[in-house]
Each structure stands twice: as structure tokens, then as C-alpha cells.
Amino acid sequence: MSTPIVDCHTHTSFSDGTSTFEQNVAAAARAGVRVLACTDHLTLPASMEAVADAQVPHARLAEHRAAFERARETAAEVAPGLELVYGFECDWYPGCEGNVRAWAAGAAFTLGSVHWVGDAGDVAAGTTGEPGTERVAPAGQPGSGAGWVDFADDMHVWEELGADEVWRRYADAWCAACESPLGFSSMAHPDLPARFSAQGWAPTIDLVPLWDRMAECARSTGRHVEVSTAGLRKSCETFYPSAGLLRRFARAGVPITVGSDAHRAADVAHAIRDAYRYAAAAGYASVDAPTPDGDWQTFSL
């Protein structure tokens, strides 16, 4: 019996996706998906993001949940075998814990992710779009050595720090996210800086010590890690994490989830079976997926 298709990382137009919950559900139904986790980008502090075009704005969190519940009703009608899970992709940044607890309340599944390195500014000064937050000092300005590591339109962090230091700081932040008392369900795209390796930003240092540290952090904190097919659609043209890092996670006994990181309905469940084969080659015999009530279920590969 083949492993059911599960996709534990998807986005809608509430954050930076282009599709609705219902469109993702329809795509999942066509692909025969068993579990679909809806993980829009969680609300961010105004210090990190001046315009709320890549996150669920705080003012729309209730609307977001209501839209999900309507999609769950639709799924029950058009795809009775599809389990829809309410979650968020939650950015980790210094001091994020209070924000994430408040804004992700009610989520059954949380993807911890690191997209930012360095000082995030006054993260308690309010959320993007709230009255008065236009006066919040923006973090991550050129020359600060802080900011987004995956934003192709603004590479100042890479230019200021260089690829080797970006990787070091990313690994530091990733391990801090694993160790956070938030207890993220799974850690998304564990080696995200690889996105730009084929564009002149490949590290010159040996990444093995960083990989070993990341594997130990995930093991010691009880985190799951994600095998993501998103890299296949990027310039790096491979899975996150790299085979070497995934083998280390496997040897450390770190369980995995699998996700497409779909930002449009057409990418829901993209290459999930390929990800299963990739994980099996790295030493995995099973994949985990969340249940709608926040528990885990395991499927053999």
C-alpha cells in the first residue's frame, strides 16, 4: 500500500499566496491528498515589515480562521477523506514568543521558520498596519547586518555579511528557534540560505559542523523538521534540506514532515512522492503529519 499524500505547508492569499482556501482544497482533492495543513505566514511586528503584504494582518486573523472553517466544511463535502489542519508558518526572531503565542492562538500546527537574521527592532511596538505603527523604527536597514535572507529584491544582508556569515547566523537563529519555548511543531525548510547558492552566494566554509549542530538541536529539543519540495521550484533546483543535512537528521532520529510550500493551488502536493523517495534514500522509514486536533499520525514510507 502506497504512502498517503500529505502536504504540511501551504499558503493562501491571506498572506503571500495567490489562491483561496477553497482552491487549495480543490487542488488537494484532485491530487488525492490525505492531510493538508494550511500554514499562512503569521502576523509580524511593524519593525520587521512595514507593509502587510506577506503575512496575515492582525486585523484579519479572525476572518482568516472563519475562512478556514468554511473551507473545512467544503472539504467535508467534496473530499471526505481529506483532513484539513489549521496552522501558521511562524517566523522566529529575537523576542517573538509573546507575539506568536497571541497571534497563533488556536493553531493545531505551527511551522517554525527562520527568514530573518539579526536585530528585529522593537518587536513589542505593534503589528504591521495598526494605528501608530508607522512611527515604529524599521529594523533591517542597509548597513545593519540584519534583515531577510530570502528576499531576492533586497540582498543587503548577503552583501554586508557574505555567504559564510549568513549561514553561520542562520544556523544560530535556527537552533534558537528549535530551543524556543514555543515548541514549534516542525521546522520549515531547514537550510533556506541554499536558495541563493546557484546565484553567486554559495558558502565557502564547510557546512558539516553547522549541519551537525542543527541535527543535535532538533534532536535534543524534540522538533520535527520539514522536507520541502519548494527548492525544486527555485534556482537551487533541489529539496530543502540538502541530502547531507537530511542524512544527519535521520541518523539523529529527528522525525520529518513533508510540504510543498505552495503559494498557488497548482503547487499543492507538488513532488510529494519524490520527497518520500528522497527521505527514504536518506534513511527515513516514515513521515509524520499533524491531525486537526494537534496530535501526530505516522505513515510508513
Where are these regions (language model features)?
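An N-terminally biased module of ancient metal coordination in phosphate/nucleic-acid-related enzymes
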Residues: 1-94, 127-130, 136, 193-198, ...
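Structural preference for beta-strand elements that scaffold enzyme active sites
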Residues: 3-7, 35, 81-87, 108-111, ...
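Conserved, mostly hydrophobic/aromatic
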Residues: 9, 28, 110, 189, ...
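Non-catalytic positions within long, well-ordered alpha-helices that form the structural scaffold/packing
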Residues: 29, 178-180, 250, 280
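Extended substrate/RNA-proximal surfaces in nucleic-acid metabolism proteins
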Residues: 58-220
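A short acidic, amphipathic alpha-helical/loop segment
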Residues: 98-100, 244, 274
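Active-site-adjacent C-terminal substructures of enzyme catalytic domains
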Residues: 206-260, 264-268, 285
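Mid-to-C-terminal alpha-helical segments outside catalytic/metal-binding sites
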Residues: 267-301
